[in-house]
Amino acid sequence: MFDVTAIGELLIDMAQSGMSDIGSSIFEANPGGAPCNVLAMLNKLGRSTAFIGKVGDDIFGKKLKNIVESSGTDIGGLVFDENVRTTLAFVETDEYGDRNFSFYRAPGADMMLREDEVNVDIIKQSRVLHFGTLSMTHDVVEKATVKAIETAKASGLLLSFDPNLRPPLWDSMDRAKQKIDYGCSVSEIVKIEIDELRFLTGCNEINKAVEIFRTCYPNVALLTVTAGRSGSRAYYKNIYAEAPTFLNVKTIDTTGAGDTFCACCIDWFLNNGGKEVKEAELRNMLVFANAAASLVTCKKGALLSMPEISDINNLIKENENNE
């Protein structure tokens, strides 16, 4: 039995890590992919997890398999393909740790997962299925993702969705919006970044955009909206909460911050979904998730940099003492 299974991309983040003596950019190969980042944090929170996806039968694919397995995630749903290479994402960061992406994915193994390769037995043994839109950018992997979602729905699972919009990977932003709409329409848990929310709703004013979202997707029991250094907010039933981010950390790379946050919210929902909660409890969820997300930005390579619960609580306590 798994608490959370995720389907989607597993890839190599080629993260900029300085300059050589002759002025050439140096890139560091780190394991990445939003779904597995989410699972890695859930493992730290004591959850049992499994992954469904595809990598190339190459040095990167084998490295990823070993790393994901060593993080505690079951890889019974991981498929190797000898005909296509593992996807690479080159990541440049600015002075704030924010990122620009260049993807080598034409095609990449993650987008070639077929629906007949989806391990439905793993899904049926899970409580939650988590997914994003990178596994819906192309027809082959979209069919696999839809099969996973339909299997999850038929088996009574909760669905968790993070759009994780990457415009360079879409041939049409209209199609991207359609897939975000689909993901939101089938899920009980949605974590969305503020610019993604504006893109989906067509509304720049945050409160109005949330109102539009909640009207369009009454199925979403827990909605969280992240805004980077501006903090986050959450909506659960008729309760609203917000919390600032933790700025007293030395940010190196924001890769995986949203995934870390998302994992903490999934964990909270597994404990509290369906219960009556107070605003303070919802805010505590955000504080914990914000702290975890802040800590993961202090290192490169999110999947291998997920914080321990003790470190998260220590940061929260340190912040309270400084207020």
Locations of regions flagged by a protein language model:
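Short, conserved phosphate/pyrophosphate- and ester-handling motifs at nucleotide-, phospho-/glycolipid
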Residues: L42, E193, G258
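Glycine-rich phosphate/adenosyl-contacting loop at the front of the ribokinase-like
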Residues: M1-I75, L113, E323
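Active-site metal-binding loops of divalent metal-dependent hydrolases
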Residues: L10, L134, P163, T260
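Conserved N-terminal subdomain of the carbohydrate kinase-like
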Residues: S48-T133, N313-E323
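Structural alpha-helical scaffold elements that stabilize or flank donor/cofactor-binding regions
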Residues: D121-I122, Y182-G183, C216
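Conserved beta-alpha-beta core of the PfkB/ribokinase-like small-molecule kinase fold
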Residues: M136-I212, S230
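Conserved phosphate-binding/catalytic region of the ribokinase-like
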Residues: F2-T5, E150, I206-E323
